[in-house]
From Swiss-Prot:
Signal peptide segment: 1-28
UniProt keyword terms in alphabetical order: Fertilization, Secreted, Signal
Primary location recorded for the protein, binned into one broad class: secreted
Subcellular location(s) per record: Secreted
Protein name, as recorded: Sperm-egg fusion protein LLCFC1
Composition bias, Polar residues: 38-49
Gene Ontology CC annotations of this record: extracellular region
Pfam families from the UniProt entry: LLCFC1 (PF15838)
Renumbered residue ranges of the record's region Disordered: 27-51
InterPro entries: LLCFC1
Listed GO biological process terms: fusion of sperm to egg plasma membrane involved in single fertilization
Amino acid sequence: MPPLAPQLCRAVFLVPILLLLQVKPLNGSPGPKDGSQTEKTPSADQNQEQFEEHFVASSVGEMWQVVDMAQQEEDQSSKTAAVHKHSFHLSFCFSLASVMVFSGGPLRRTFPNIQLCFMLTH
Protein backbone atom coordinates (compact mmCIF):
# COMPACT_ATOMS: atom_id res chain seq x y z
CA MET A 1 0.00 0.00 0.00
CA PRO A 2 1.56 3.35 -1.04
CA PRO A 3 1.99 6.12 1.51
CA LEU A 4 -0.91 8.53 1.92
CA ALA A 5 1.05 11.81 1.65
CA PRO A 6 1.86 11.62 -2.11
CA GLN A 7 -1.74 10.66 -2.87
CA LEU A 8 -3.01 13.60 -0.84
CA CYS A 9 -0.61 15.99 -2.60
CA ARG A 10 -1.74 14.64 -5.97
CA ALA A 11 -5.40 15.12 -5.02
CA VAL A 12 -4.76 18.67 -3.80
CA PHE A 13 -2.96 19.40 -7.05
CA LEU A 14 -5.66 17.94 -9.31
CA VAL A 15 -8.77 19.41 -7.64
CA PRO A 16 -8.16 23.08 -8.68
CA ILE A 17 -7.19 21.98 -12.18
CA LEU A 18 -10.37 19.94 -12.59
CA LEU A 19 -12.49 22.76 -11.19
CA LEU A 20 -10.95 25.25 -13.60
CA LEU A 21 -11.40 22.98 -16.62
CA GLN A 22 -15.17 22.53 -16.30
CA VAL A 23 -16.77 21.98 -19.68
CA LYS A 24 -20.28 23.29 -20.15
CA PRO A 25 -22.49 22.13 -23.04
CA LEU A 26 -23.24 24.56 -25.83
CA ASN A 27 -26.77 25.93 -26.18
CA GLY A 28 -27.35 24.18 -29.50
CA SER A 29 -25.94 20.80 -28.52
CA PRO A 30 -28.22 18.11 -27.09
CA GLY A 31 -28.00 17.63 -23.37
CA PRO A 32 -27.65 14.33 -21.56
CA LYS A 33 -31.45 13.98 -21.34
CA ASP A 34 -32.12 14.95 -24.96
CA GLY A 35 -31.41 12.41 -27.64
CA SER A 36 -32.44 14.69 -30.47
CA GLN A 37 -31.88 18.30 -31.27
CA THR A 38 -34.99 20.44 -31.70
CA GLU A 39 -35.17 23.62 -33.71
CA LYS A 40 -36.50 26.66 -31.89
CA THR A 41 -38.50 29.30 -33.72
CA PRO A 42 -37.80 32.89 -32.68
CA SER A 43 -40.66 34.92 -31.29
CA ALA A 44 -42.14 37.99 -32.98
CA ASP A 45 -40.21 40.31 -30.63
CA GLN A 46 -36.89 38.82 -31.68
CA ASN A 47 -37.77 39.18 -35.36
CA GLN A 48 -38.67 42.83 -34.81
CA GLU A 49 -35.39 43.42 -32.98
CA GLN A 50 -33.38 41.84 -35.80
CA PHE A 51 -35.28 43.95 -38.33
CA GLU A 52 -34.44 47.13 -36.43
CA GLU A 53 -30.77 46.19 -36.08
CA HIS A 54 -30.24 45.62 -39.78
CA PHE A 55 -31.91 48.78 -41.03
CA VAL A 56 -30.30 51.48 -38.92
CA ALA A 57 -28.54 54.12 -41.02
CA SER A 58 -26.09 56.85 -40.15
CA SER A 59 -25.27 60.08 -41.91
CA VAL A 60 -21.69 60.56 -43.11
CA GLY A 61 -21.41 64.01 -44.63
CA GLU A 62 -24.08 64.11 -47.33
CA MET A 63 -24.05 60.34 -47.91
CA TRP A 64 -26.07 57.76 -46.02
CA GLN A 65 -24.35 54.61 -44.86
CA VAL A 66 -26.11 51.45 -43.67
CA VAL A 67 -24.84 50.38 -40.25
CA ASP A 68 -25.13 46.73 -39.34
CA MET A 69 -25.72 46.69 -35.59
CA ALA A 70 -25.49 42.90 -35.46
CA GLN A 71 -21.90 43.06 -36.78
CA GLN A 72 -20.97 45.62 -34.12
CA GLU A 73 -22.41 43.37 -31.41
CA GLU A 74 -20.41 40.41 -32.73
CA ASP A 75 -17.21 42.48 -32.63
CA GLN A 76 -17.91 43.53 -29.05
CA SER A 77 -18.71 39.96 -27.99
CA SER A 78 -15.49 38.65 -29.57
CA LYS A 79 -13.45 41.26 -27.69
CA THR A 80 -15.23 40.33 -24.46
CA ALA A 81 -14.56 36.64 -25.11
CA ALA A 82 -10.87 37.36 -25.64
CA VAL A 83 -10.67 39.27 -22.35
CA HIS A 84 -12.45 36.43 -20.52
CA LYS A 85 -10.12 33.86 -22.06
CA HIS A 86 -7.04 35.87 -21.08
CA SER A 87 -8.28 36.35 -17.50
CA PHE A 88 -9.07 32.62 -17.28
CA HIS A 89 -5.53 31.72 -18.38
CA LEU A 90 -4.06 34.20 -15.90
CA SER A 91 -6.14 32.85 -13.01
CA PHE A 92 -5.32 29.28 -14.01
CA CYS A 93 -1.57 29.99 -13.95
CA PHE A 94 -1.86 31.79 -10.61
CA SER A 95 -3.85 28.91 -9.09
CA LEU A 96 -1.41 26.35 -10.39
CA ALA A 97 1.56 28.31 -9.03
CA SER A 98 -0.07 28.73 -5.63
CA VAL A 99 -0.85 25.00 -5.43
CA MET A 100 2.75 24.17 -6.29
CA VAL A 101 4.10 26.61 -3.69
CA PHE A 102 1.77 25.54 -0.88
CA SER A 103 2.11 21.81 -1.53
CA GLY A 104 5.89 22.03 -1.55
CA GLY A 105 6.28 21.04 -5.20
CA PRO A 106 9.78 21.29 -6.63
CA LEU A 107 10.95 23.43 -3.71
CA ARG A 108 10.64 20.51 -1.31
CA ARG A 109 13.79 18.80 -2.66
CA THR A 110 15.81 21.99 -3.10
CA PHE A 111 14.96 23.70 0.17
CA PRO A 112 13.82 21.04 2.68
CA ASN A 113 14.14 23.43 5.62
CA ILE A 114 11.53 25.91 4.33
CA GLN A 115 8.64 23.74 5.47
CA LEU A 116 10.31 23.09 8.82
CA CYS A 117 10.94 26.81 9.40
CA PHE A 118 7.35 27.61 8.48
CA MET A 119 6.05 24.98 10.92
CA LEU A 120 8.27 26.30 13.72
CA THR A 121 7.17 29.92 13.31
CA HIS A 122 3.44 29.24 13.00
